[in-house]
Amino acid sequence: YITLQERDKLFEADLSARPQLAIQRDIFVFQSVVGCRVGDFYKLTKKNIVNGALEYIQEKTRSHNPRTIRVPLNSVAKTILERYKDYAGATLLPFISEQKYNQAIKEAFQLAGLDRIVTVLNPLTRNPEQKYLYEVATTHTARKTFIGNMYKKVKDPDLVSSVSGHKEGSKAFRRYREIDEEMKQELVHLLD
């Protein structure tokens, strides 16, 4: 996931020469502060904004155990919604296709200078590879950013899962709870 500083760097990057790319960047940042899956995100409308929060039922749980997810909107989300308040399309924000959205995310990351090296598994060989962050950024990076940064701030898995839509004790949720270097530093300093 990206840090809050990286998210802000992306959000503040001057993409005025590429207005369509700037729109997709804004959508990514919005997704990273509300945390929903891209499949749910594409279906959101202005009616999903209820009393200062994003409210929706996840597609993934709709058929067997539907739960309403309610994520209060922070100042970044409100800024983005204000920016697109005159958008008259059927969706909450002006999406392009998921494939083009993923490509736009990569371009926006690169133009914003989000180029740190990350280690990822090659899906074919299952061997670790080092890549630039902008090469591996996707819509799912937004969800990971939301969950990872939220967990880093509150360290309460139940509270975080209440806004991410995961069930309590979910195996899927555990993979988002990375213990980063800063958290390890805090941990060892408890012994000082």
List each language-model region with its residue ranges:
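Basic, Lys/Arg- and aromatic-enriched nucleic-acid-binding interface segment
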Residues: 1-38, 42, 99-100
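DNA/chromatin major-groove-contacting recognition/catalytic segments
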Residues: 9-10, 69-83, 174-192
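Conserved helix-loop functional segments at active or binding sites
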Residues: 12-16, 47, 79, 114
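Short, basic (Lys/Arg/His-rich) helix/loop patches that form interaction surfaces
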Residues: 16-21, 86-91, 106-162, 166
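Exposed loop/turn and edge beta-strand positions of beta-sandwich/beta-sheet ligand-binding modules
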Residues: 24, 67, 75, 87, ...
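Conserved tyrosine-mediated DNA breakage-rejoining catalytic core shared by Y-recombinases
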Residues: 34, 43-82
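A short, basic/aromatic helix-end/turn motif that makes direct DNA contacts
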Residues: 43-49, 151-153, 161-168, 175-179
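Catalytic-site neighborhood detector that most strongly recognizes the C-terminal catalytic loop/helix
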Residues: 60-62, 98-101, 164-189
